[in-house]
From Swiss-Prot:
Organism: Xenopus laevis (African clawed frog)
Keyword list, A-Z: Developmental protein, Disulfide bond, Extracellular matrix, Glycoprotein, Lipoprotein, Secreted, Wnt signaling pathway
Post-translational modification: Palmitoleoylation is required for efficient binding to frizzled receptors. Depalmitoleoylation leads to Wnt signaling pathway inhibition.
PROSITE patterns to which the protein is assigned, alphabetical: WNT1 (PS00246)
Entry keyword Secreted: yes
UniProt record similarity statement: Belongs to the Wnt family.
Location of this chain's protein in the cell: Secreted, Extracellular space, Extracellular matrix
Protein name: Protein Wnt-6
Any matching Pfam family: wnt
Function: Ligand for members of the frizzled family of seven transmembrane receptors. Probable developmental protein. May be a signaling molecule which affects the development of discrete regions of tissues. Is likely to signal over only few cell diameters.
Gene Ontology BP terms: canonical Wnt signaling pathway; cardiac muscle tissue development; cell fate commitment; embryonic camera-type eye development; embryonic digestive tract development; heart looping; neuron differentiation
């Protein structure tokens, strides 16, 4: 929530307040935190309730993320899902996030390759002095 005062000479005769969205980065960080703590669940016999699977004792609350099926392994090619896998992809060796080699190469290691590209820049030299 953010507020602004109104009035003569800065006196706060009345205040206007409004709800404000958090910064995009903050929203992403919250989602990642919830994703990393997501609960695996299965449906109850009554068809309405969910039951946590595994060693989780506390049932998930309304703000927790839940899932019922494991995600496929995107590291390996899978014809059934149409996933080409990550083998042979270009990665960033210095990045620690999604495009980084540690995550993208799935622990297989990577091969570094330096590519030199020569291009004709159509530059011209002008003698000035």
């Amino acid at each position: 929530q953010e507020c602004k005062c109104h009035g003569l000479s800065g006196s706060c005769t009345f205040t206007t307040c409004w709800k404000k969205m958090p910064h995009f980065r903050e929203v992403g960080d919250r989602l990642l935190e919830r994703f990393n703590g997501a609960f695996k669940v299965m449906g109850g016999n009554d068809g309405k309730t969910i039951i946590p699977v595994g060693h989780n004792i506390k049932p998930p609350d309304k703000q927790d993320l839940i899932y019922s099926a494991e995600s496929p392994d995107f590291c390996q090619a899978n014809r059934k899902t149409g996933s080409p896998g990550t083998r042979g992809r270009v990665c960033n060796s210095t990045a620690l996030d999604v495009g980084g080699c540690d995550l993208l190469c799935c622990g297989r290691g990577q091969r570094e390759e330096t590519v030199v590209v020569e291009e004709n820049c159509l530059c011209r030299f002008h003698w000035c002095c």
